[in-house]
Amino acid sequence: MPRPASHLAPMPSDHPDFRSESSARLRCQPPRTNNCGTFKQPPSVAATSRPKPGNPFLQPPTKGTPPPKKKKKNHTEGCHTHEANPEPNTKHTETESPKPQTSTQHHTPITIPSSLLSQNTQREKRGLPLLTSRPSTIPANTYQPQSPHIHSHTPLQRPISTALLHQNLHIRARNIRHTGRLHGSPTKGAQTAQQAQPHPPKQLATL
């Protein structure tokens, strides 16, 4: 049985699509397309979304004014004022406070009498501490630099001559003990040495 062609018949005039003018306008106008057949955007949207030719970062801004540059802070602003006659500021002072003039008394030359120098040379030979004299102008509790040729803090060292003398005496005493024991007349010191060292070294026995 053939299908009726009712779906191809025109719509009656009382259909709701025919009643409204907006629906009739949409039905009559085809969609706007470009040459490729795709949907065309309205001109307002297309103008804003289309990229500009070239690098947009290198182009100067065409619309509006450039943002105002930040002003550098003037040096006169703030708490430090540089005027011709500035008021005395007790909190922030850039000038250093004057230091007490104490450096002059450290550089005053110290006069040392010749008698003291001769005594110091003799004391230095003996290994004794040297003598220093304080001038009466400088108080006793202040620091007083000493001249470079006087060394008052040298450590007490035994002179080389006395050290050699003690070494020679020690060697002589040992030789006397061994020679006395070899001749058969040991002294009291040799007896104690014999008890401490029953077997003396061979090189000392040959003496």
Curated annotation (Swiss-Prot):
Belongs to the UPF0328 family. This is UPF0328 protein ECU02_1590/ECU04_0060/ECU08_2120. Residues 98-121, 133-149 have a biased composition (Polar residues). Residues 14-24, 75-97 have a biased composition (Basic and acidic residues). Residues 1-154, 180-207 are annotated as: Disordered. Disulfide bonds: none annotated. It comes from the Eukaryota.
